[in-house]
Amino acid sequence: MKPSERRKARRLAVQAIYSWQLSGNNIADVEHEFLTEQSLDGVDVAYFRELFAGVATKKTQLDELFIPHLDRPIDEVSPVEKAIVRLAAYELTFRKDVPFKVAINEAIELAKAFGADESHKFVNGLLDKLVARK
């Protein structure tokens, strides 16, 4: 498997997590929508499924990891940033085969692609604190 396949899976997973957070729709429905309506060329579909389902089912546990390091209430964190941080927290916690530097770098790149101008700095700082705590 090429690293770019995982990168594309992360990108799709962040979009699905974002959609799920905002819509409140059933996890299976959101996953089905993304798997049938998005281009899956070069996407590690199994990894996408794991990331999306993992974040959705372990949201509370993941939030508890980074909430102590927030500089504001979680309700004030943008939905895009929450989706990215939850995905990275999942990889850092449950995917020991993914080096922490890779998980953080991928999250920063996602924040640059989808977040506001300074999102990548927020995501980087928060994940650095999360890793330092481990």
Curated annotation (Swiss-Prot):
Record has RNA-binding as a keyword: yes
InterPro entries attached to this UniProt entry: NusB-like_sf, NusB_fam, NusB_RsmB_TIM44
Domain of life of the organism encoding this protein: Bacteria
Pfam families for the chain: NusB
Keyword vocabulary terms for this entry: RNA-binding, Transcription, Transcription antitermination, Transcription regulation
One Gene Ontology MF term: RNA binding
GO cellular component: cytosol
A Gene Ontology BP annotation from the UniProt entry: DNA-templated transcription termination
Residue runs in coiled coils: none
Task performed by this protein: Involved in transcription antitermination. Required for transcription of ribosomal RNA (rRNA) genes. Binds specifically to the boxA antiterminator sequence of the ribosomal RNA (rrn) operons.
Similarity comment: Belongs to the NusB family.
The protein's name: Transcription antitermination protein NusB
Source organism: Shewanella sp. (strain ANA-3)
